[in-house]
Amino acid sequence: MAVEIEQFMCRSDNFGVLVHDPKSGQTAIIDAPEEAPILAAIKRTGWTPTMILTTHHHMDHVEANLALKERFKLRIVGPEAEKAKIPGIDETVEEGSVLHLGDERIEVIATPGHTAGHVSYHLPASKVAFTADTLFALGCGRLFECKPPVMYESLRKLAALPAATTIYCGHEYTLANARFALTVDPTNSALKERATRIEALRVDNKPTLPTTIGEELSTNPFLRWHDPAIRKHLGMEKAGDAEVFAEIRKRKDNF
């Protein structure tokens, strides 16, 4: 039986997520951006959280850790490399670590780039992954603590997940990402169609997430370093994949 997922907005543009295993009754919170919206989601669903799965140390992902831990006596899991920066952490994980939500297997993927210790959580049986600020819909996270080749390798890992994998990200950045994507991949018809859909969703204040690996592979320039049209547009036909990624990231930083 697949997990049930409740996605909701926190702060100005963060996504909060609850992941519930109906068989065991266990519930995980993916990051804790803000207490009040998380409590509202818990009340709305009737699910009692048993753990927080932290992806990285930035305050807009851990702010409610201690308040939720005190209220629900839950355990907080997070990356070993950032344990000193994550409030209330009880258990650390790294590449290859395995957790369980009831019988649901959670595989930890090290995805540094945005921060040096960032991790993503993959639930293969439910075909879902939580990538926070590594992979966004039509984008990737800004590189605060790592160089472009590090993020490139992290995105390669995520791109290798099955195309049908549903992806939940950390922020509602998709509209701005779409506008940038069109500047580096202007002839991509799938991207143009997706950008139109995104514009309509945001006019109605509707979320653009979740997405899928397959959709990102066809439209997200940060996963399309190999594409001949993008390479030609950038004048980088003979460059290495990591170089193309770095140029796209540089352009996004200045967009």
Swiss-Prot record:
Keywords, alphabetical: Hydrolase, Metal-binding, Zinc
Binding site for Zn(2+) 1: 56, 58, 114, 133
InterPro entries given in the database record: Clx_II_MBL, Glyoxalase_II_hydrolase, HAGH_C, Hydroxyacylglutathione_Hdrlase, Metallo-B-lactamas, RibonucZ/Hydroxyglut_hydro
EC numbers on record: 3.1.2.6
Coiled-coil residue windows: none
Binding-site residues for Zn(2+) 2, renumbered to this chain: 60-61, 133, 171
Cofactor: Zn(2+)
Quaternary context: Monomer.
Role played: Thiolesterase that catalyzes the hydrolysis of S-D-lactoyl-glutathione to form glutathione and D-lactic acid.
Protein name, UniProt field: Hydroxyacylglutathione hydrolase
